[in-house]
Amino acid sequence: MAALGHLAGEAAAAPGPGTPCASRGARLPGPVSSARNPSTVCLCPEQPTCSNADSRAHPLGDEGGTASKKQKNKKKTRNRASVANGGEKASEKLAPEEVPLSAEAQAQQLAQELAWCVEQLELGLKRQKPTPKQKEQAIGAIRTLRSKRTPLPRKRQLMHSLFGDYRAQMEAEWREALRALRAAAYSAQVQPVDGATRKKSQRVCRPRSIWRAKATLDMPDEEFRFNFF
């Protein structure tokens, strides 16, 4: 009986599959409840409350995320700025630099412009019927443009007042003359003719025997001599 009671006591002390262990049940209920519900407060006086720890942990994570995002955005903006600067530099390198004209080229261009303006004034006097006042003004303008004492700004001002944008007019006239020359050169070239056109325009000229007989009859056998008497 004592053995049976001892065995029964051991069986009662041994944990079953559905009953929790005694060592597990020795834990305090406070931390477990706080772990399950983070809004509850721990009973330990030395440790901070769970709600405070959670509230401290989350802002740090948010601040770190925002800081990393800001750094990434800064890097992206720097890369875009460097790419844009590189593209601008490349476009500047590819753009052709305008070479200023030399003194000789400028003098030659000015002489051509003056000659064109003088020629236009002379043609206007010849082809049109100007009034005496217009004729006097045109002659005065020709003298001013041909004079070496007249300063260059005065000549340019006079040409601009008479013809407006004279450089554009000169360029248009030059293009028209070049087009006419090209058309004349193209028309002067000998172009090969196709076989069909040759067959259509082909003609055969054969002399007739009647004309030969008449020519032989009209020619005398005697030698021709001048008869002055």
UniProtKB/Swiss-Prot annotation:
The keyword Ligase does not apply. Residues 69-79 have a biased composition (Basic residues). Belongs to the UPF0488 family. The modification N-acetylalanine is found at A2. Signal peptide: none annotated. Keywords: Acetylation, Methylation, Phosphoprotein. Residues 1-96 are annotated as: Disordered. Disulfide bonds: none annotated. It holds the Pfam family DUF4615. This is UPF0488 protein C8orf33. The modification Phosphoserine is found at S82. The modification Omega-N-methylarginine is found at R27. Residues 1-16 have a biased composition (Low complexity). The lineage of its organism: Eukaryota, Metazoa, Chordata, Craniata, Vertebrata. It comes from the Eukaryota. InterPro entries: DUF4615.
